[in-house]
């Protein structure tokens, strides 16, 4: 019985973390979570898919997808800017059925467009993209955002303290 008690004692947050980053340094890395967590990755995948869809709609050679109205663009931008934990959880629910993370984003986005009667655009979600395309771009945007909004300002602050 004492062994079980000791095992439970050692199963604390820090000892069940994947690395020291989310364990003993979790307080120092808290600001990175919205960008580099799984939530952040899902959010950035959504952003990549939407920006690609907007780019396709702006291409006059793709006549099957009309240019988005201001109202539709506003809705798409809202999906990016107001992406929430609830949205990420909905995508994770879809992923449980599809067993495919990027496909789950695609299905979630299709549903969001269907709700706004943007059915023509539905056919062009993920058009000519691979999952690797979406992931590579999402990770690149995450790195850029993390560097510009957290890492570089932190380095500048430390540098000014050392002067």
Protein language model features and the residues they cover:
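N-terminal amphipathic/basic-hydrophobic helices that include classical n-h-c signal peptides
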Residues: 1-10
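A helix-coil-helix interface module used to build multimeric assemblies
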Residues: 9-163
């Amino acid at each position: 019985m004492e062994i079980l008690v000791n095992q439970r004692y050692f199963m604390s947050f820090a000892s069940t973390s994947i690395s020291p980053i989310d364990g003993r340094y979790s307080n120092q890395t808290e600001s990175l979570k919205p960008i580099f967590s799984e939530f952040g990755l899902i959010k950035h995948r959504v952003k990549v898919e939407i920006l690609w869809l907007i780019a396709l709609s702006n291409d006059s050679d793709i006549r099957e997808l009309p240019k988005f109205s201001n109202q539709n663009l506003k809705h798409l931008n809202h999906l990016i800017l107001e992406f929430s934990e609830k949205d990420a959880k909905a995508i994770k629910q879809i992923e449980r059925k599809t067993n495919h993370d990027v496909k789950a984003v695609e299905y979630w986005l299709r549903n969001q467009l269907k709700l706004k009667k943007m059915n023509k655009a539905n056919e062009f979600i993920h058009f000519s993209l691979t999952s690797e395309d979406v992931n590579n771009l999402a990770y690149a945007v995450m790195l850029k955002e993390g560097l510009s909004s957290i890492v570089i300002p932190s380095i500048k602050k430390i540098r000014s303290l050392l002067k």
